[in-house]
From Swiss-Prot:
Active-site residues per Swiss-Prot or TrEMBL entry: D236
Protein name: Ceramide glucosyltransferase-B
Intervals, Cytoplasmic compartment: 33-195, 305-309, 370-394
Domain of life according to the entry: Eukaryota
Subcellular location: Golgi apparatus membrane
Regions of this protein lying in the Lumenal compartment: 1-10, 216-287, 329-348
Amino acid sequence: MAVLDLALQGLAIFGCILFFVLWFMHFLSIVYTRLHLNKKVSDKQPYSKLPGVSLLKPLKGVDSNLINNLETFFELDYPKFEILLCVQDLDDPAVDVCKKLLGKYPSVDAKLFIGGKKVGINPKINNLMPGYEVAKYDLIWICDSGIKVKPDTLTDMANQMTEKVGLVHGLPYVADRQGFAATLEQVYFGTSHPRSYISANVTGIKCVTGMSCLMRKEVLDQAGGLIAFAQYIAEDYFMAKAIADRGWKFSMATQVAMQNSGCYSISQFQSRMIRWAKLRINMLPATIICEPISECFVASLIIGWAAHHIFRWDIMVFFMCHCLAWFIFDYIQLRGVQGGPLNFSKLDYAVAWFIRESMTIYIFLSALWDPTISWRTGRYRLRCGGTAEEILDV
């Protein structure tokens, strides 16, 4: 009986610690968002002295927003940059989109590469290899096809690339679009994701997504170049790790990495979250414990039980109050990341928030159940440590 009492006491203490850690993350991410994101920073170097940048753009297929997204890169206000458009297949409709933009902007230093180069199992790396091999500038900007930018986005990122910084990344967010699926994505990327992403980076944990990353080519080459990361599906994590291992710091851009895909749905969002969870579990096994207890409903139950055990407070009353406080702070976080008025009502936010939170256990269990993922044109079996093998159809 004494052992059981001790175990329950330990669990209650854990619940209290969890409460303080999670609310520290809430406050930290909100304060950082208010102080750093969507702020016009003073130029750290003269415009004409900004370093040259080689933009690597991996392309696969076409959606309704692709040409508009790509065009924003051709309209960048930056002194020296090149655009290296990389398409895997000759018959990909993205080829025609690229040729149209190359014809429309002849003064922009841009080239189209078709065919890729097979160096590993990662299709994105294979696609980018021809562009990477001819990149002429010291800074490499890898930016996904669904991202759109402002004319001064690259200037903002380059100004963050100070002497001791080896990687500048943008906080992923989602552009205003129509439909509930768009609202669901915006709520996730404006609440749960930035809370973890910002808290990790501010406290020194290297957390980077590869949607928009500006890196020093010299450092990547020291790590073996892009080919060194072709064995991984989550190449962005291992690129960031390689840069950090060499003593370089990271910096977050003041502008978000604005996702603007023209193809989106609730099922696509759910599949994407499951794929990401699978990658995290295989790269960082501690995720199996940390991830579920960092979500609102599970955390509220654990903390509510701890409050009942220690203070004899009603579990359900505490659970409801804790969820309500979480809901309100998430809304504050969302408004900060948005940097302006939201494109949907508070009722839409409430529904999307509840559905997103309700999905979390299903997403996590689905990720545990099946270690294979489908990405781009292939299926892959994940291994512990982050490597993967391609599953070939027999």
